[in-house]
Amino acid sequence: METATKTPWHLWVIGIVATLWNAGGAYDYTMTQTRNEDYLRTAADNAGVPYDTMIGYYTSFPAWADAFWALGVWGAFAGSVLLLLRSRFSFHAFVVALVGLAGTTLYTLGTDLPAELNSPMMWVFSLIIWVVTGLLAWYARRMTKKGVLR
């Protein structure tokens, strides 16, 4: 007879915070892909970037870069939800997110970013996304090995 592994309290905390964090990324992705003018104008204003520069940058993405961005965003969101559902596939979703993040990062590094977008804050935020996603993948793997995720 198999004994059920008790769900540790930290899984719920990490899962809820991760889902909220990644829901923010999913919202940003959706608003950007649908070219929501109010959202993009506010984002441009908050970043101190001209609206035309921001919209020009996002509309210049090739399809493959958009695809990697989608993998990163939706993989991370799925991983967070799967973590709350105690599914071992949470780890796999976070790996998909890391692949998407790698593709998006390679595109960004290989692109001539408009000077207004190429700020230290943008690179710091990218690093934060890498760290958070990597830690979530590690956590999901660890919880799978402990039998918490099935």
Q: Model segments located where?
A:
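Topology signature of small-to-medium multi-pass alpha-helical membrane proteins
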Residues: M1-R150
